[in-house]
Amino acid sequence: MYTKKPTIPENVIERAYKGKCTKEDALLLLEGNPFELFELANDLRAIAAGDTVSYVVNRNIYITNKCVGNCGFCAYRTEKGYILSIEEILKKAGDARKAGAVEVCVQGGYTPEADMEFYLEVIESLKAEYPDLCLHALSPMEVNYAAETSGMSVEEALRRLKKSGLDSLTGTSAEILSDRVRKIICPSKISTQQWIDTVTAAHKAGISTNATIMYGHVETLKERLDHVFTIREIQKETGGFTELIPMSFLPYNNPVGEKMLASGKFSSTGLEDLQLIAISRVILHTYVKNIQATWVKLGKKLAQVALQCGANDLGGTLMEDQISTASGGSHGEYVSPAEFEWMIKGAGRVPVQRDTLYRKIESGFPGQEGLFPGYAKAGMGSKE
């Protein structure tokens, strides 16, 4: 019989169960046996979320690939690109709704051509045409840039977005919440404090957000942990985060990645991915209930393993993911509801469909077993 004694100190475990993990505790857990960390995180997941694993039938809609930013990790932006018209956006949303989507995620670059008045028209038009769709849209960066372009404060922009029908703001553009890192990888983006102020203002305006962390580039381990602890501090104040989504950096077709690859460094390892999901569960226990294992970054099989390491959500069907694909993502752009159910049951968990705000949706696969038009059934919904 295997009887190896756990090496995690009892006081560290006690603090974890109470939601009082310290930075010193987190470092100790990451430096120790990873499987003990996974076991602890999995137990905390069971306490916080039970044995259900959620997913959302959604579609990404990329409004524009034009962007005046200079992010070194991005392979998506272009100075000569497209901006979708309102009619084109509504068409994409309509196709998604027919396929059973309950959410559309509207995002893109930031450009003077997309000011706050444009975004307000997009939100109002979508909500008028599809009132039952959850509108998960814009990042703190887009809100700041568009608000400034339109000559209004961030607070006013958020109030007007809420009034227009915005259900949830994306928590992207966080990258790593360290100004040292941001000056290297995204010098023209909002500062750490501006990101914090924007999501805090959104929460206070009644707009929930998710939170993200993009890791595996120039940040240190301490900066990763500081990021997650920052999310915890915001959540203590506002309670407005629905989930944390760890996203591994994709090092292809972008300047930051080119430098990494030239120096012999590659993207985060699978073990690092699982450790970050696990330590995020430990740090955020009692504060943020949902930790996502995003299949489009991790791949389906590692995402399934992550369900044993603290994750309780697999994200969305997506239907398209231009940003990951541009940076070398190779895991496809679509997973059908049927395949999500298969993955979750295969991990010994209970699948649950949800919406953006983690409200349960009665499942019932639309159309051809939930397959989005244009994807072959033989591929189980994965365009690879």
Swiss-Prot record:
Residues 53-286 form the Radical SAM core domain. Disulfide bonds: none annotated. Keywords: 4Fe-4S, Iron, Iron-sulfur, Metal-binding, S-adenosyl-L-methionine, Transferase. Its cofactor is [4Fe-4S] cluster. It holds the Pfam family Radical_SAM. InterPro entries: Aldolase_TIM (IPR013785), CofH/MnqC-like_C (IPR045567), CofH_family (IPR019940), Elp3/MiaA/NifB-like_rSAM (IPR006638), F420 (IPR034405), FO_synthase_su2 (IPR020050), rSAM (IPR007197). PROSITE patterns: RADICAL_SAM. Pathway: Cofactor biosynthesis; coenzyme F0 biosynthesis. It catalyses: 5-amino-6-(D-ribitylamino)uracil + L-tyrosine + S-adenosyl-L-methionine = 5-amino-5-(4-hydroxybenzyl)-6-(D-ribitylimino)-5,6-dihydrouracil + 2-iminoacetate + 5'-deoxyadenosine + L-methionine + H(+). Its EC number is 2.5.1.147. The keyword 4Fe-4S applies. The keyword Iron applies. [4Fe-4S] cluster binds at C67, C71, C74. It comes from the Archaea. Signal peptide: none annotated. Binds 1 [4Fe-4S] cluster. The cluster is coordinated with 3 cysteines and an exchangeable S-adenosyl-L-methionine. Consists of two subunits, CofG and CofH. Catalyzes the radical-mediated synthesis of 5-amino-5-(4-hydroxybenzyl)-6-(D-ribitylimino)-5,6-dihydrouracil from 5-amino-6-(D-ribitylamino)uracil and L-tyrosine. Belongs to the radical SAM superfamily. CofH family. This is 5-amino-6-(D-ribitylamino)uracil--L-tyrosine 4-hydroxyphenyl transferase 2. It comes from Methanosarcina mazei (strain ATCC BAA-159 / DSM 3647 / Goe1 / Go1 / JCM 11833 / OCM 88). The gene is cofH2.
